[in-house]
Amino acid sequence: KSVGGTPLFFAKGKGSTIWDEDGNQFIDFCNSWGPLIHGHANGYVEEKIIQTLRNGSSFGAPTRLESELAKLIKTNIPFIDKMRFVSSGTEAVMSALRLARGYTGKTKILKFEGCYHGHVDSMLVKAGSGLITLGSSSSAGVPETVANETLVLPLNDENMLIQTFEQYGNDMAAVIIEPVPANNGLLLQDLSFLQLLRGLCWKH
């Protein structure tokens, strides 16, 4: 009810195509928020899933396949020093923010309007009413004391970004951004904005 309208219920998918319960056909640009980069019902992927399931469903402990995947990721993205596998994007963000706060001893997080980072309390925050303001809760159940630790800025506003770092830079544990944000109609950031943000992060 909170988002309005009637949600689509999907019945099946094949490749890049999905069908809803009424038989309407869509191109799937979501890909289950990332994991389905090979599309729906991919024969090779299905075969590997079945092969793996025959050796057990879930162990709740590390496996050889996790180590092999970690090595593959490291080979293709060599600047990654450490990695951790989790069950959802929300857990990944939650872990990253906790690590940043623990390592820096700082508490504030900077995020940007329209970017989605899971159901972490400190990410369910919208911009306040002032020019540079602490965030306010956008979801019932998120205390304002938690929301107040999150700064929220509009995308591509370089002046506000500079002002925010001047005011809060020494209190920030981390900055989180979605370079290709699906929830705001793919409002892409300017390269100069991202470069400025990267430089400010290194500086502070």
Regions found by a protein language model. Name each.
Residues 101-106, 125-132, 192-196:
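A glycine- and small-aliphatic-rich helix-loop capping segment at beta-alpha/alpha-beta transitions
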Residues 25-106:
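Glycine-rich loop-to-alpha-helix module at the N-terminal edge of alpha/beta enzyme cores
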